[in-house]
């Protein structure tokens, strides 16, 4: 029993989670009945394997060696649970208009070059739009855009994030989103930003989204996405769910 407890604890550390977050995810996923051949590992351990893959970005061979399973089993677990975690994040999303939001874009390096392009980081990347709540860095929505060599407004327009921002009314953004009416951006005069007290206050508040993106990229899968490009949206949703769980359970012990 002691050896089993130590093993679970080591798995939790590797997945950067704790028993409470793991129990929450398992309870949410255990309600849906699944047909087909039963899994050789329980749901709790499969969730740990999927979280470890997102957090560490280990290869299938390395995951199989750590959890003592076959490579095909490790691949099936990650490929099956990642979309379910992303769907759980979309179900749990509850926009709150009491607090201001912040939107920004970031680059996700990808190995699949079909939907990616060389961008300012000199790597093939895809653009991801992130919408967070300024108060606690809770991710309201996250979307996978197109090639990373295009500006943020190109990916923002027509996305679900734009629909949410139009209904909110208090969304901060940087100067790259200039001209979008529903966003609060710095004031320009003569093609230059007016660096006054309003701009300094806006800069301090908008910097919170950079902190949120940095925390999201603690999950190393967003630093080098090795899966197919069409799986990037599910990966982003799963990471957003795990990030929001850490924020929610931290504020409500």
Tell me the role of every PLM-derived stretch.
Residues 32-34, 57-64:
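Glycine-/proline-rich flexible loop or hinge segments
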Residues 14, 38-39, 52, 66-70:
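Short secondary-structure transition/capping motifs
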Residues 42-57:
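Short, amphipathic alpha-helical "recognition" segments used to contact nucleic acids or chromatin
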Residues 42, 46, 62-253:
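Short, well-ordered secondary-structure "scaffold" segments embedded in the functional core
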Residues 1-40, 124, 181, 247-252:
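Basic, low-complexity segments
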Residues 8-10, 59, 160:
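Terminal low-complexity, poorly structured segments
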